[in-house]
């Protein structure tokens, strides 16, 4: 695009260098300090890059957005505020492109990110609900095997939830003298 921000052009050039990509894949210790010192990449530049990938997604440029989000995820720390959003974005890009294998990988990455993040129970529940929603697209397009995996995704926490509900119901019945059916 001719109207890409300068930061986006610089990062696109950075990510197009095969030696840089190879180094990033082999060295998991690359962080923003390293990128700033050795390549002049700052957090602000990455933020512009992330926002521009969202712009490309909103314009229907899913392949470009997916590529940009993949690059962004390769340098951003998993605990950063935008990491989960970038995972969701790449998942959405791959779903609308019907890339079911990659979508499944991203679905699991999102699930793992939800589980390890320190967020409120309500936010975690909301994220899991969205995970199930997007999971429908991924699993229903994988045939019978996908339906089985979807059922597992829905039931994975079900036994814990069922136990919790029964425990609360039992205590409530004793406290309020109610008979459980």
Please report, for each region that a protein language model flagged, where it lies by residue.
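Extended alpha-helical scaffold regions
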Residues: 1-181
